[in-house]
Regions:
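Conserved N-terminal subdomain of the carbohydrate kinase-like
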Residues: 24, 47-127, 290-301
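Structural detector of well-ordered beta-strand residues that form the stable sheet scaffold
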Residues: 54, 79, 130, 156-158, ...
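Short beta-strands and strand-loop turn motifs
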Residues: 100-102, 126-133, 176-181
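Structural motif
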Residues: 1-3, 99, 127-128, 209
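Conserved phosphate/ATP/ADP-binding segment of small-molecule kinases
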Residues: 145-225
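Conserved phosphate-binding/catalytic region of the ribokinase-like
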Residues: 193-301
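Glycine-rich phosphate/adenosyl-contacting loop at the front of the ribokinase-like
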Residues: 1-56, 64-66, 301
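Short, conserved phosphate/pyrophosphate- and ester-handling motifs at nucleotide-, phospho-/glycolipid
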Residues: 46, 178, 244
Length: 301
């Protein structure tokens, strides 16, 4: 079983404009609403690949119920803890640029946190937990560490700062920093010459597998024995939201379904790229189209 954790989910409210002018009244050409949050994004791609992940986390108020209902309408399972305060709405403005306005999110009480930890009792050894995203301001900074300690499951972790190092001793199945984040973790500038070296440091510190996304330059995959680079695939960028989460979901799907690591990496690349070329999380047809174009080359060992 695969579980995803979204501690601070949102309605992602997307507004599309031809042109944005600060201080003016503007009518959007289109607007869309999706359940948002990194764990939810990973769940959606896993569902589109044929898995049945369970969404865990916190939702509250009418916004939270909209999120939960939207997830169920997609055919996804959810066991969110209901909290007193409202979940958040994040606004994403899309014109010739992309601007995101993310709300702070609700305060979560100690009693609500304990309910969440109780929900972890059903997770068994051999299950996989996808942990991603920043924590709400009211949760302790070691919240994710407690999740890991309370279960015997494999886990992936995708968080954007140096705190990632604190989780490597628990031997995560996958970590997925981008190039900029990798540099911040080790307080250095990453370039083509040292990219594999610093990705490998994450292996040496405990990560079983590492994917570093490089934007338009593609990505690399590193484990304890090999390093591979996926060439970038040409196409029109439609949506940057959820591409990284789709990569994580694709890799987890591959590992759960006993694919070779390199095939799991190829699927991760296909999922991330397909989502970037789609208005929402990519469907299976789009993933398959992109998968046929994925090329990887070994770049070291």
């Amino acid at each position: 079983m695969i579980y995803t954790i979204t501690t601070n989910p949102a309605i992602d409210y997307i507004l599309r404009f031809d042109k944005f002018e600060d201080g003016a009244t503007i009518r959007a050409n289109e607007d869309e609403k999706y359940p948002g949050g990194k764990g939810i994004m990973a769940s959606k791609i896993l569902h589109n690949l044929g898995e049945k992940p369970v969404n865990l986390g916190f939702v509250g108020g009418f916004i939270g119920e909209y999120i939960a209902n939207s997830i169920r309408d997609l055919g996804l399972d959810e066991k969110f803890v209901r909290i007193k305060e409202n979940s958040r709405i994040n606004v994403k403005l899309k014109y010739d640029k992309e601007t995101e306005i993310n709300a702070k999110g609700p305060k979560i009480s100690k009693e609500e946190v304990e309910k969440f930890f109780d929900s972890l009792k059903e997770i068994e050894k051999g299950d996989v937990i996808v942990i991603s995203g920043s924590l709400p301001y009211s949760l302790d900074s070691d919240f994710y560490k407690k999740v890991i300690e309370k279960t015997e499951a494999d886990f992936t972790i995708d968080i954007a700062d140096k705190k990632l190092l604190d989780y490597l001793a628990f031997k995560p199945l996958l970590v997925k920093p981008n190039e900029e984040e990798l540099g911040k973790i080790f307080q250095t500038e990453i370039n083509d010459e040292n990219l594999v070296e610093y990705a490998r440091k994450l292996n040496e510190l405990g990560a079983k597998n590492v994917i570093v996304s490089l934007g338009a330059k593609g990505s690399i995959f590193v484990d304890e024995n090999h390093a591979y680079r996926a060439k970038p695939i040409e196409g029109k960028l439609v949506n940057s939201v959820g591409a990284g989460d789709s990569m994580v979901g694709g890799f987890v799907y591959g590992m759960v379904n006993k694919l070779d690591k390199i095939d799991a990496y190829k699927l991760a690349v296909a999922c991330g790229t397909a989502t970037a070329f789609s208005p929402d999380i990519a469907d299976r047809d789009m993933i398959n189209q992109i998968l046929s174009k994925v090329e990887v080359e070994e770049i070291g060992n």
